[in-house]
């Protein structure tokens, strides 16, 4: 990864492990350590489950602490949005999201087994994820309006399917058949992966449109 900081210096960054910033104590401990390593940028997870533990109520404590400690150490921050997916799975989504399978449906394998992966074909999944991400971006625009500390934002993390090459849930099958995908593109894992890549991209690209508040 290469980008330019406001001082026109190349990024020399280090990425925290998945759950290394889940508390104020974690952040207080890790930021000085990153500075001692000679880094100028830290890639830090932004956890949806900790930011919106109750639907519609946002807690930016960890975000604020990350930025304040980074500033104290002279570090820049790249936030990684652990939203609907992280390494394919929906493990960092909030409990209220994960427990309401009817409202936020899961992807399924070819045998109809529900996977621990929110379906990207669900409008409810999209709206909930986007609402939280938009709240985070609005907060950052107020806390760091000139992007002097937060220099980048990664949208989702390693999205894709595990166990099954594509989603076989009812919503996904409807899209698959409507496009006559098998007829036009063939079958098999490669074709299935291309199908999913298209719809994951469509999911993320739709974020260009501002959500209804």
Regions found by a protein language model. Name each.
Residues 1-40:
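N-terminal carbohydrate-binding accessory modules
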Residues 26-104, 203-212:
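Aromatic-lined substrate-binding rim segments of carbohydrate-active enzymes
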Residues 11-13, 41-43, 74-78, 148-154:
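Structural preference for beta-strand elements that scaffold enzyme active sites
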Residues 22-27, 58-62, 126-134:
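Glycine-rich anion/phosphate-binding loops
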